[in-house]
Structures are given as C-alpha cells and as structure tokens.
Amino acid sequence: MPFLVALSGIISGVRDHSMTVRLDQQTRQRLQDIVKGGYRSANAAIVDAINKRWEALHDEQLDAAYAAAIHDNPAYPYESEAERSAARARRNARQQRSAQ
C-alpha cells in the first residue's frame, strides 16, 4: 500500500507550494532513515534532495555548455591560440619575477 507524504515549501514565512507524494514501502523506509539521520522532518529531507539533484543537473548543464564551447573553440576561454600563448607567456614571466 502506498504511503503519502504531504510536502509544503515555506519561503520567508509564506506558504509557497504544497503537494502530496506517493511513496512505495522501500522509499518510505529510506525517507524515514534519512530523517533519523539528522533532518528535522521528511519535508526538509525531500526539499534538500530536490535541491541537491537540481544542483547536480545544473552542473551537468554547465559541463555540457563548456564542452560545446571547447568543441567550437579549442583555445576557450581565449579567442585564439595566439591570445592563449600570449597570456601564458605573461603569466610565466610574472611567476619568474615573483620567484626571484
């Protein structure tokens, strides 16, 4: 029999959204274990899980965009290989001066 969890998001003391989630027994048990591990409520654990997954998705999207930029311009973030070489030469000279 499915287990229902009511979720409500509170932002600045104002109820933003609420929903009911249907969990199978295994997922319900996992949620209870997570809550016992230090969350103040099942709602807090679920909100945290959503936020962590969103951050991971966002990182994946940024990585994909970076890979596309590198594919289009192997010298990225520089406009050209000449600009990249000039920047490296300046950096190397600066490091040599500061090491002396």
From Swiss-Prot:
Region (Disordered): 77-100
Record keywords: Toxin-antitoxin system
Residues annotated as signal peptide: none
Keyword Aminoacyl-tRNA synthetase included in the entry's annotation: no
The keyword Phosphoprotein is assigned to this record: no
Domain of life: Bacteria
Function field: Antitoxin component of a type II toxin-antitoxin (TA) system. In M.smegmatis neutralizes the toxic effect of mRNA interferase MazF4, its cognate toxin, on growth.
Subunit structure: Forms a complex with cognate toxin MazF4.
Official protein name in the record: Probable antitoxin MazE4
Gene: mazE4
